[in-house]
Curated annotation (Swiss-Prot):
Residues 101-147 have a biased composition (Pro residues). It holds the Pfam family Desmo_N. InterPro entries: Desmo_N. Residues 83-149 are annotated as: Disordered. It comes from Orgyia pseudotsugata multicapsid polyhedrosis virus. This is Uncharacterized 98.6 kDa protein.
Length: 875
């Protein structure tokens, strides 16, 4: 009786513990359901409907509505409906109330409660030993009599599980859900289901098979867009125009590939695409670099991109400029020809100017002669007007005088005759009266004739005056006509000469401005050349001094090396002799005594060599090892030889064999300095070679760069190199940080694995203890043993599933972390490769620029040499 009571008590205790574990698992599942579906009514939930409800929760993640039929079973709006099954039976609880929310009511047709051994409680963990069934169809236990529905008690979750479910709730939102989050969700729910509800391999396998839903799509577009954002810093969203955006980039690449390579791009794999993209990028960078160099060379300014329209206009303008370069060369020849023509035109202009001046002088002389003739004509007219009456009077008086003289002579003769005949009386008086009357008549006739003559003379004077005035007027009109014709011709010539002179003056002004610019540039170049010559002269003097010092040092070195070699040989011989002397003893030393004079000579030579070497290196030997010539010591000579040998070995290591040739090459200082300067200029990028006013030095001005500009350019290059070094250091620091993070993550994973191993060992020890307990107590009730074995198998299954879940989770964490770290490392490596490619491109640009600068410098040197030889043209 006592044994039966003890067996009954043990059986009841085991069953109560199993029911408590089952209740705890149900509470945990209830918590998960509440987290995922806060509005779900748990009061009407049947505990036996848990497996189907969990399957529905795993498959229904898109917000579908769920209809709960508490009287029969759950019908879920999923792709495939569950097969029809009868309602699950309610478990029988013989020992008190199991569900605290609502106690189970016994059916009316079953008044008697069966005994516990004959009717065990219905437990989901006991479903494991059943044969395999589909995940959608729960096992069919024996149908007990119908009972009233009982409310489901919520399961209790651990703090870690609640934290994981909260993280899953955040990750499973519409904005953050991904395939990895979905897989994590399935793994977490599977682990909770195995731990808290039921551990069925087929059910767990069916739930884990939900992870294969990602095979329904080719790729996760959110992951794709995140990858694009990480790789290119461009952020896109899933929208109807996403295909057109991606197609636009692909078409751009295809068109660019077609334009550059003249072939259609064919996609093979990602490696070939990456190689083609990098090659195409390199080609485009080289083309843009070539365009920028051509733009700087042609436009004398740096190219700045604003928009595509301006770029097209710039390309057209640059193309026109480049096409105009041969025309410019032809224009140079034409300009030289125009210079010659201009000089000829200047000569013609000078001749025409002289002709104009002589014509003006002749015109002025003619005008003066005309004015003098006109004045003389007017004066003659006035004199003629005054002399005409006088001439008439003079002629009249002359005629009258002659007539009067004739009449006087006649009258004298008559008077004389009358005087002779006065004696004759009346005859004489009559004769006198007759003569007087004749005289009066003659006087009257003379007066009348004088009046007629005056009238005739007046008419003739009038005719003469008229003819004279007419002749003078004709002459003046002729002179005026000739003057006007000459003036017209002169004005026409002056107009033509004025236009020619104006055109020549404009050309002369342009040529003068060009010549002034050339003169200013030549003056600047001359000043810079003079400054460079001064610097070169100073450099020549400094190099000459250094050369002299180096030659002297080389001579001293050669002499010291020769002396050292001789002294070394002699010392070796001396040491051999001393060794022989020491071996031979005092008697042999007397017989084989070394020549004292030869030994002193060798020690003196070694001391002289040491003193000469001490001039170049005062710290030779660490202390003064000079000997007293009156007291030469062999030990001190050995220290001198050792110090000289060390010094010459150091000198031999620090001095290259080509240094002597380099020292000899320093004699041609001018070529060396120019070569060094040209090498420095060619190795410096064009955008760093700037003047004091921040202007880029033109290629033709590279030969005239002063030392200040060159030093500034080198400083800029050093600063750029320092900046790149800092960036490289930052990248190395970032790489080191990522490496440390990876190490930390690995250590964390190792610790977690160690803790899992400890838990596994602990569980195995517990299982071993239980097995030992079963072996040592064979008298226990078979049902209790069966329960213990069931619990043991369930624990082992849970342990195995927990181990697998932990391993999967750790692998996922490690894989995710490794992928993230590898992505970061790949980004850093790509940045470093980009910097290296940029460095290689810059180095290539420097070498190309060096070649170009050498050619430009040679052409400029030839031009300056020709300009220095040829005299400047005379204007």
């Amino acid at each position: 009786m006592q044994r039966d009571l003890l067996s009954t008590i043990n059986s009841m205790s085991a069953r109560i513990k199993a029911l408590e574990r089952y209740e705890h698992a149900l509470r945990e599942i209830h918590k998960v359901i509440v987290v995922m579906r806060p509005g779900f009514n748990l009061q009407v939930l049947d505990p036996d409907a848990m497996p189907a409800l969990i399957v529905q929760f795993f498959s229904d993640l898109t917000g579908r509505n769920t209809t709960h039929n508490i009287n029969y079973r759950y019908d879920y709006n999923v792709g495939g409906a569950l097969p029809f099954q009868p309602p699950p039976p309610q478990p029988f609880y013989p020992y008190g109330q199991y569900w605290p929310q609502q106690p189970p009511q016994p059916p009316p047709d079953q008044p008697q409660q069966p005994q516990p051994p004959q009717q065990p409680p219905q437990q989901p963990p006991q479903q494991q030993p059943q044969p395999p069934q589909p995940p959608q169809q729960p096992p069919q236990p024996p149908q007990p009599p119908p009972q009233q529905l009982a409310l489901v008690q919520q399961i209790e979750l651990s703090v870690d599980e609640v934290r994981e479910l909260q993280a899953l709730q955040l990750n499973m939102q519409q904005q953050t859900i991904t395939w990895s989050h979905f897989a994590t969700f399935i793994g977490t729910m599977t682990r909770i289901l195995q731990t808290r509800v039921v551990n069925s391999a087929f059910l767990i396998g069916a739930i884990e098979a939900l992870q294969n839903v990602d095979r329904l799509t080719n790729y996760d577009f959110n992951e794709f867009l995140r990858c694009v954002a990480n790789e290119t810093a461009l952020r896109f969203e899933i929208a109807p125009d996403l295909c057109r955006v991606v197609a636009a980039f692909i078409q751009f690449f295809q068109k660019t590939h077609m334009v550059v390579y003249r072939t259609t791009f064919t996609y093979v794999n990602s490696q070939s695409l990456t190689a083609s993209a990098e090659a195409l990028h390199l080609v485009i960078v080289k083309l843009f670099w070539f365009f920028s160099k051509i733009y700087v060379y042609v436009m004398r300014a740096e190219f700045v991109y604003t928009n595509s329209t301006a770029l097209a206009a710039t390309i057209e303008e640059l193309y026109a400029r480049v096409e105009a370069i041969p025309v410019a060369a032809q224009n140079s020849a034409e300009l030289a020809q125009l210079h010659a023509e201009m000089r000829a035109l200047r000569t013609v202009t000078a001749d025409l100017q002289g002709m104009r001046d002589s014509a003006e002088q002749r015109l002025q002389a003619a005008n003066a002669r005309y004015e003098a003739a006109d004045a003389k004509s007017r004066e003659l007219d006035q004199q003629l007007v005054r002399l005409r009456p006088l001439a008439a009077q003079s002629e009249t008086l002359r005629f009258e005088k002659s007539e009067l003289a004739t009449e006087n002579e006649r009258l004298r003769g008559e008077i004389a005759a009358l005087q002779n005949a006065s004696a004759n009386g009346l005859a004489g008086a009559e004769t006198v009266s007759r003569l007087t009357a004749s005289l009066a008549d003659a006087q009257a006739q003379l007066t009348a004739r004088t009046a007629e003559q005056n009238l005739v003379m007046a008419q003739k004077d009038n005719e003469y005056a008229t003819k004279t005035q007419q002749a003078a007027a004709d002459y003046v009109a002729k002179l005026n006509a000739e003057r006007e014709a000459y003036e017209r011709n002169l004005r026409a010539k002056e107009d033509g000469l004025g236009a020619t002179i104006q055109r020549l003056q404009e050309e002369n002004a342009e040529l003068r401005s060009t010549l002034d610019n050339r003169n200013r540039e030549f003056a600047q170049g001359s000043d810079q050349f003079a400054a460079v010559n001064m610097q070169l002269n100073e450099a020549r003097r400094a190099v000459a001094e250094k050369n002299g010092q180096l030659v002297a040092a080389n001579e001293i070195r050669a002499r010291l090396e020769q002396q050292l070699a001789d002294a070394t040989q002699q010392l070796a011989k001396t040491e051999q002799l001393l060794v022989q002397q020491q071996k031979s003893g005092p008697m042999e030393t007397d017989k084989q005594e070394i020549n004292k004079e030869e030994s002193d000579y060798l020690l003196t030579a070694l001391d002289i060599m040491y003193k000469n070497a001490r001039i170049l290196n005062p710290n030779l030997g660490g202390r003064d090892l000079s000997q007293n010539l009156n007291d030469l010591q062999f030990g001190l000579a050995s220290e001198q030889r050792l110090a000289l040998e060390q010094w010459f070995s150091t000198l031999r290591e620090t001095t290259a064999p080509n240094d002597v040739l380099n020292f000899a090459a320093l004699t041609n200082v001018n070529d060396l300095v120019n070569d060094l300067k040209s090498q420095i200029i060619t190795k410096i990028p064009a955008n760093m070679l700037r003047t004091f006013d921040n202007r880029i030095v033109k290629p033709e001005e590279a030969g005239a760069v002063d030392n200040v500009t060159l030093i500034s350019a080198v400083s800029r290059l050093v600063d750029e190199y320092s900046r790149l070094g800092l960036e490289n250091a930052q990248l190395e620091s970032t790489n080191k940080t990522l490496y440390d993070d990876n190490v930390t993550l690995s250590e964390t994973c190792t610790q977690q694995l160690k803790s899992l191993r400890d838990d596994l060992n602990k569980n195995m020890s517990n299982v071993d203890a239980i097995n030992d307990l079963v072996k040592t107590t064979p008298e226990l009730d078979k049902q209790a043993i069966q329960d213990v074995r069931t619990e043991l198998s369930k624990t082992q299954s849970r342990l195995k599933s927990l181990k697998e879940a932990k391993l999967v989770e750790l692998k996922q964490m490690a894989s995710t972390s490794a992928l993230e770290e590898m992505s970061k490392l790949n980004n850093n490596i790509r940045e470093i490769n980009s910097l290296l490619s940029k460095h290689a491109a810059i180095t290539e640009d420097i070498f190309k620029w060096k070649t170009t600068m050498l050619e430009v410098y040679e052409s400029l040197a030839r031009t300056m040499a020709e300009e220095n030889v040829l005299p400047p043209p005379t204007l």
